[in-house]
Amino acid sequence: MVAKPDAFRYDTNGDDMKDNILIEKTIDFGARIVKLNRYLLETRQEAVLSKQILQSGTSIGANVNEAQYGNSKADFIAKLHIALKETAETEYWLRVLEKSDYLDENMASSMLSDCLEIKRILISSINTAKDGQK
């Protein structure tokens, strides 16, 4: 049975990355995106938009995680910028899915809220890292 979209929550159970709130939030969000993709494919028979949001929504966390292993501060900032761009794309797809009635307002609002929170944290992290470069 496919999880209902309002249940797109993933609980992490303590690992080495737990100290980094951004990584934790992007893992949780990525898991919600995977569940959303499954819902869209299995319940709504939607394959095109679901693939788009799966790619952008899971790429956010992948780039944040990769940034932790950057060769330099500039590399770290560049990876966070990529994650920020993926966040903007994911926000776009969530709005399209809502406007096209694949997601109801409550589902879209919950996921958009998480997406925008990650976006704010990324912007703050990028600004802090840039200030540290000066």
Spans of features found by a protein language model:
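Short, C-terminally biased terminal segments at protein or domain edges
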Residues: 1-62, 66, 70-134
